[in-house]
Amino acid sequence: MGKYFGTDGVRGVANQELTPELAFKLGRYGGYVLAHNKGEKHPRVLVGRDTRVSGEMLESALIAGLISIGAEVMRLGVISTPGVAYLTKEMEAALGVMISASHNPVADNGIKFFGSDGFKLSDDQENEIEQLLDQTNPDLPRPVGEDIVHYSDYFEGAQKYLSYLKSTVDVNFEGLKIVLDGANGSTSSLAPFLFGDLEADTETIGCNPDGYNINEQCGSTHPEKLAEAVLETESDFGLAFDGDGDRIIAVDENGQIVDGDQIMFIIGQEMYKNQELNGNMIVSTVMSNLGFYKALEKEGIQSNKTKVGDRYVVEEMRRGNYNLGGEQSGHIVLMDYNTTGDGLLTGVQLASVIKMSGKTLSELASQMKKYPQSLINVRVTDKYRVEENIHVQEIMTKVETEMNGEGRILVRPSGTEPLVRVMVEAATDADAERYAQSIADVVEDKMGLDK
């Protein structure tokens, strides 16, 4: 991570950390690095946003910065992050930009870039933009007169994206009753249109954005509301998206949550059966449940683990030419169809498996037995020394021996806070909690703030 760019673009409290002034600079410098300096006089740039009240303010500043470098901007309006990624590649734009802070609260916002290939930026590209941000007044081109280009609205882009998503499945969803939770964000209108066009009987919650209620007790980070709605409406299943539509969490007909691991397993199993799973491999992160790996092993499907973060999943998928990967949190990447996590795409693929199999979502999900998980955060003086602490390693070895293959331990430094995260999966809830606490006690005793 750099000074401005985190693992998913530039984020901060809107109008405090992510100001219009910074948005203008990101537009100007990002447009120069990723488009103008490649020789295009008027590179095409697509700009989308989620439903946050600060989105229009930042959008105006960003577009001004892009136009100041000579870009031809097409404003997509409210659309999902994967929608921007898809359209950037499909329309051969030089650059795509999404204004969103994903699943974060309404006060936050963010700006993320996509290259002409639809992928997020490389570290080198982000560093080049950061170097310009740190200069007082970089000497960059300033078109004048007839060389300044109008921006245009291209709200039809969302429909183009939805038409593409419909084309990725071979069946309609007639006979399926589905509850959709748009997190009062980017998918609030997209999801009902998509599943309605595919002839599903839909109910909606979290699809009435007012600029302030994005992710508020709804969406993929609060699936309990969706579970209630599925039971109340006697629906076949429910799908919850996050604020910018790159995550999905499902709920089965019994109101039980079906997370990203289970969704990956269900879709991966179908792809494997149809000989469509590249390398017979699914890429996940170290946070995926032990039950996920055991279920894959039973099916004869291989797995590859990365660090936490969808960008690392995508990097590994590109390296090995794999076409399915994701995170327990619901970032699912189906590389045959899009370059980034796509909640709507994953949703139609999951619904397609349910429709074609004739099985309920609970039946499909039950093939993967989730191990109970316990997570404890310990505040420490130096989180990066946990791997070399002999006392921590000793207790981890002791616990692993006791679990005898029926559990998993993950002890790692937090990426954003002075914490060590202790995660244990075991055969029972009691075992997971007991083992996690025994490790956390040693971490706190040997590495805590008073040490």
Swiss-Prot record:
GO terms for molecular function: magnesium ion binding; phosphoglucosamine mutase activity; phosphomannomutase activity. Its cofactor is Mg(2+). InterPro entries: A-D-PHexomutase_a/b/a-I, A-D-PHexomutase_a/b/a-I/II/III, A-D-PHexomutase_a/b/a-II, A-D-PHexomutase_a/b/a-III, A-D-PHexomutase_C, A-D-PHexomutase_C_sf, A-D-PHexomutase_CS, Alpha-D-phosphohexomutase_SF. The keyword Metal-binding applies. Keywords: Isomerase, Magnesium, Metal-binding, Phosphoprotein. It is an enzyme of class 5 (isomerase). The modification Phosphoserine is found at S102. The active site is at S102. Pfam families: PGM_PMM_I, PGM_PMM_II, PGM_PMM_III, PGM_PMM_IV. It catalyses: alpha-D-glucosamine 1-phosphate = D-glucosamine 6-phosphate. Binds 1 Mg(2+) ion per subunit. GO terms for cellular component: cytosol. One of its GO terms (biological process) is UDP-N-acetylglucosamine biosynthetic process. HAMAP family: GlmM_B. Catalyzes the conversion of glucosamine-6-phosphate to glucosamine-1-phosphate. Belongs to the phosphohexose mutase family. This is Phosphoglucosamine mutase. It comes from Staphylococcus epidermidis (strain ATCC 35984 / DSM 28319 / BCRC 17069 / CCUG 31568 / BM 3577 / RP62A).
